[in-house]
C-alpha cells in the first residue's frame, strides 16, 4: 500500500475514533493523487453541519450510500486492469465505461463536499471576484447564469465553474459523471444536480435545492483554487 494511502486511512481512523476532530478540506491535487485501494474521504464537517440547507438524512444517503457505492464499485472494477496503479486523475483522463463513470463520480463527489461549508454563502472576494465581474458583469449575473446551467441540465449531471488553459472563467454543464479534467480545465466549483443530491429534502424541486446550495458555497476555498 502506498504511503499517501496509509496516511489518508490513518486520518479517517482518527476521525472515527474522535468525532470532535474535523477533516481538513482536500485540494484538487490531493483528490487527483488518490490511488487503490480507494477509501471514502472523510467529510470536512459533521453530518448535520449543512442543516437546514441540506439535511443530515440526505448526507447519510448521498455521502454514506451513493458516494460509498462509487468507491466500492471502483475498487471492484480496477484490479487486473491497466489502471491498477493509476491515480484517480489518470483514471478520469484515460479510462472509459464503468471505470471512468465510478472514478469520476468518486472525484466529483469528493470535490463537491469540499465546495460546501456550514459557514458558506455570501460572495467571493479578491482576484476571483474581480475575474467574475470582468467575465459576467457582476456576481449576481454570474450566479444567475450558473443557476440556469444547473436547472437546464437534462437528467443527471454536474454544473461547473472552471478555469481554462488561458486562465479564463467558464460555466459548463456535464451529463452523468462528466468531469472537466478530461478537457484540460481546472475545476473551481461544482453543483451536483443528480436527484439523489436533493430528493429527500426537496423531492423534484431542483430550483429549491439551488437556492439552498448558494447558502453553503465556500467562496474562500473556491478563491484559493482560482
Each language-model region and where it sits:
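Bacterial Sec-dependent N-terminal signal peptides
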Residues: 1-25
